[in-house]
Every structure is written in C-alpha cells, then in structure tokens.
UniProtKB/Swiss-Prot annotation:
UniProt cross-references to SUPFAM superfamilies, sorted A to Z: Scorpion toxin-like
Subcellular location: Secreted
Name of this protein: Potassium channel toxin gamma-KTx 4.11
Top-rank taxon: Eukaryota
Record function comment: Reversibly blocks Kv11/ERG potassium channels.
Coiled coil: none
Tissue-level expression: Expressed by the venom gland.
Disulfide partners: C5-C23, C11-C34, C20-C39, C24-C41
Protein's UniProt keywords contain Disulfide bond: yes
Keyword Disulfide bond: yes
Length: 43
C-alpha cells in the first residue's frame, strides 16, 4: 500500500523518482513524487 512506498523510499528532495512511482502504481495510485525525501503517492 501507499504507506509502504513512503517507508521504502530514499529519494531526492523534490521531483519524480522512478522507484517511488512504480510502488505507487502497484498500490493503485496514479503517480509518485518526492517531497522532502519522502515518497508521496497521488491518487
């Protein structure tokens, strides 16, 4: 689920991050981006 994406992600401060995006898509979200080094999934 989307919370596991956040836990796993070590990404840049801002912007697109492939691993985060993949995880979010598997969780049924539209896209994943990074905000302050955390993955955020957007519906």
């Amino acid at each position: 689920d989307r919370d596991s994406c956040v836990d796993k992600s070590q990404c840049g401060k801002y912007g697109y991050y492939g691993q985060c995006d993949e995880c979010c898509k598997k969780a049924g979200e539209r896209v994943g981006t990074c905000v302050y080094y955390k993955c955020k999934c957007n519906p």
